[in-house]
From Swiss-Prot:
GO biological process annotation, one example: L-proline biosynthetic process
Protein species of origin: Ectopseudomonas mendocina (strain ymp)
Alphabetical keyword list: Amino-acid biosynthesis, ATP-binding, Cytoplasm, Kinase, Nucleotide-binding, Proline biosynthesis, Transferase
Residues engaged in binding substrate: S54, D141, N153
Name by which UniProt lists this protein: Glutamate 5-kinase
InterPro entries according to UniProt: AceGlu_kinase-like_sf (IPR036393), Asp/Glu/Uridylate_kinase (IPR001048), G5K_ProB (IPR041739), Glu/AcGlu_kinase (IPR001057), Glu_5kinase (IPR011529), Glu_5kinase/COase_Synthase (IPR005715), Glutamate_5-kinase_CS (IPR019797), PUA (IPR002478)
Length: 372
């Protein structure tokens, strides 16, 4: 499986806060210079690179003299606004020493939830990569709200991997990879070298939360690998403290945990749907509709829906669940929640009579539906 790493043409590299800051005392410029040297070496070997960089909040905290991460959103956003300036300048100057150009891109979930903005972001990123520019991406913490935040840069990195159709996502962390148990408490814990991203056994060993400076624990990294797998990308979760880790991965060394995609590539629109994490409501299906979606790959018709939950507008994302509450699919609805309430359980040819008009015969078309 390691040939998937050595042969990967396009990498998304995510570096966490703990690897970019000096124990919370601001940005570690020396450490950043080491990362840049490794990435430049990869680029010289023909690898196309996109960097997802944490560290803005941590850098801002240092400049403000804060020793612990604040919980109030406005304080976090203030720290991010201050720290982002330092972060992007540090990356720019360090890459410039090697004659490499960088570009800053700040994203929110809204940017990727809207189809038009998603396509614009994808076009911009691909253009930058084509111009031999290294994009440096972070979440736009200054304007984001709880409702539209990615939650962590692991998730953001996975969505970026989808955007640019990366072959490999490398998540650099303060652990050497995923273990069979917590190595801090269990001396018998063993490193998991390779696994399928969708292996349910991984959930049991991925517990825990992020550190004081960051938001993402091992569970978020596992979720990120599964999201990246939707577009066919492999993911390596590996320790950033390992000397020359990127070069050694490129050389085929068996470092960290390599998680392989569980299925083939999704079509471009389905990739976007897979990364569309914000849902606005729920449709409860009957057994026949579950079969139609899961086995027959058909569209969801009103007749197969038993209940509508939540408030949503036409074109928004909803969750489709089985009678037992198990999530079956997600998709973009053709009718609002109020409209759906009036037509569920009814045949499609009754929609016009019930609403006075008919937009689509399906509640969710199969092209706008992804199984989970």
């Amino acid at each position: 499986m390691r040939d998937k790493v050595t042969g990967a043409r396009r990498w998304v590299v995510k570096i966490g806060s703990a690897l970019l800051t000096a124990d919370g005392r601001g940005l570690d410029r020396a450490a950043m210079a080491v990362w840049v040297k490794q990435m430049v070496a990869l680029r010289e070997q023909g690898v196309e690179l996109v960097l997802v960089s944490s560290g803005a909040v941590a850098a801002g905290m240092s400049r403000l003299g804060w020793t612990s991460r604040p919980s109030a959103m406005h304080e976090l956003q203030a720290a991010a606004a201050i720290g982002q300036m330092a972060l992007v300048q540090a990356w720019e100057s360090s890459f410039a020493e090697h004659g490499r150009r960088t570009a800053q891109i700040l994203l929110t979930h809204d940017d990727l939830s809207d189809r038009k903005r998603y396509l614009n972001a994808r076009s911009t990123l691909r253009t930058l990569v084509g111009l031999d520019v290294i994009p440096v991406i972070n979440e736009n913490d200054t304007v984001v709200t709880d409702e539209i935040r990615f939650g962590d840069n692991d998730t953001l990195a996975a969505l970026v991997a989808n955007l640019v159709e990366a072959d490999l996502l490398v998540i650099l962390t303060d652990r050497d990879g995923m273990y069979t148990a917590d190595p801090r408490h269990n001396p018998d814990a063993e490193l998991i070298h390779e696994a399928r991203a969708d292996d349910p056994a991984l959930d049991a060993v991925a517990g825990g939360v992020g550190g004081a400076l960051g938001r993402g624990g091992m569970q978020t990294k596992l979720r990120a690998s599964r999201l990246a797998a939707r577009s066919g990308a492999h993911t390596v979760i590996v320790g950033g403290a390992i000397e020359q880790v990127l070069a050694r991965l490129k050389a085929g060394e068996r470092l960290g945990t390599l998680l392989a995609p569980e299925r083939g590539l999704l079509a471009a629109r389905k990739q976007w749907l897979a990364g569309h994490l914000q849902t606005r409501g729920t449709l409860v299906l009957d057994a026949g509709a579950v079969k139609a979606l899961s086995q027959d790959r058909k569209s969801l018709l009103p007749v197969g829906v038993k209940a509508v939950q939540g408030s949503f507008r036409r074109g928004e994302m909803v969750v489709c669940v089985a009678p037992d509450g198990r999530e079956v699919a997600r998709g973009l609805v053709n009718y609002s929640a109020l409209e759906a309430q009036k037509i569920i359980g009814q045949p499609s040819d009754a929609i016009e009579k019930l609403l006075g008009y008919v937009d689509e015969p399906e509640l969710v078309h199969r092209d706008n539906l992804i199984l989970v």
